[in-house]
UniProtKB/Swiss-Prot annotation:
Predominant location category: endoplasmic reticulum
The protein, known as: Uncharacterized membrane protein C660.17c
GO cellular component, one term: endoplasmic reticulum membrane
Swiss-Prot/TrEMBL keywords: Endoplasmic reticulum, Membrane, Transmembrane, Transmembrane helix
Tagged with keyword ATP-binding: no
Annotated transmembrane regions: 46-66, 76-96, 104-124, 129-149
Subcellular location: Endoplasmic reticulum membrane
Membrane topology: Multi-pass membrane protein
Highest taxon in the source lineage: Eukaryota
Length: 172
């Protein structure tokens, strides 16, 4: 009978003194972790699709202001690159992941660096700092940085579910 002991996880709530702890058996834990994994994968996929289309929609304003075509071309390539990275690359490939090959890290840094350089060059052409800051180039630079931050947080939310999966059946 000792070998048939249930493995349980106890969840407590420190806000209520009268609160009874919730016990989950193996099947409930498996179902709970699988539900978290599915929800996390669905949310990450949804964010990837939304951000990819957002980047492609932001290409339209680039054609509305008359400036250097070389800058526009680099900004277009940067937005296409962000959309590609967000939609096609797995979350494990990122700037902050030590397992990422150096060629991808170089491309991430190059994309951010080139858009930042073009942003600074665009700022130097304007007399008003306020107008220069609200320029579309600043938005493109911000988007490239936001891409890496979003992918970093999406990757770590996936890791959190995996860590929870490893902690199942712990005895309290």
């Amino acid at each position: 009978m000792e070998q048939l002991r249930k493995r349980v996880v106890r969840f407590t709530n420190n806000d209520d003194d009268d609160f009874e702890p919730v016990f989950l058996n193996e099947q409930d834990q498996d179902a709970f972790v699988e539900q978290l994994r599915l929800t996390n994968n669905r949310d990450n996929r949804m964010f990837s699709i939304i951000f990819s289309f957002l980047y492609l929609l932001l290409i339209v304003p680039l054609f509305l202001y008359p400036e250097y075509w070389a800058f526009k071309l680099v900004e277009l390539l940067s937005l296409f690159y962000c959309a590609y990275v967000m939609y096609f690359l797995p979350l494990e490939v990122g700037l902050f992941n030590p397992k990422t090959p150096n060629k991808w890290k170089f491309l991430f840094i190059l994309n951010i660096g080139v858009t930042a350089l073009i942003t600074v060059l665009g700022w130097s052409q304007h007399t008003s700092f306020f107008y220069a800051f609200l320029n579309i180039r600043t938005l493109v630079c911000g988007i490239t940085i936001f891409t890496e931050i979003a992918r970093y947080s999406m990757y770590h939310s996936t890791l959190s579910v995996e860590k929870l999966d490893e902690m199942r059946f712990a005895h309290m």
